[in-house]
Amino acid sequence: VAELPQAPRAADWREMMLLYVDGVRDFYLSNRVEMILALLPVSLLSVNQVSRDFGQSLFQLLHAQDLVPKTQKVLRACEMTSELADLVWRKSLIEKGTLTPAYTREVKRVVIAYLESVLAD
């Protein structure tokens, strides 16, 4: 999250998530080496650590704006949304050689649906 531009104050968590999906996509598309290293890592340990770090930063951002409650459940969900997004983009990179608009729409759908289900519980 520190690599991304500062997001404006969002009306709700969905809006913030969409802003950050677009920000991550733009970062990956303009930094191909970082995209490849992040989406095609050499070990699962590195994948998990990056997802956890990004998810924790995302959770802090969402909570700081009072968009999500401060719970371990929501923290873990933010970590999972980071991993889910990377899984979908990894498929795009492997199949298409880039991050396509169709896969980015799928990332947005998946992260919103997952976090929505966690927050509804």
Whereabouts are the PLM-identified features?
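Short acidic, glycine/proline-enriched loop segments that cap or flank alpha-helices
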Residues: V68-R76, E95-L99
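C-terminal catalytic region of ATP-dependent kinase domains
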Residues: L4, P41-V42
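Amphipathic alpha-helical linker/stalk segments
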Residues: V1-M16
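Amphipathic C-terminal alpha-helical segment
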Residues: F27-S30, E34, Q60-A64, S82-T100, ...
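Amphipathic alpha-helical packing segments from all-alpha helical-bundle domains
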Residues: R14-V33, V42-L67, L75-E79, R105, ...
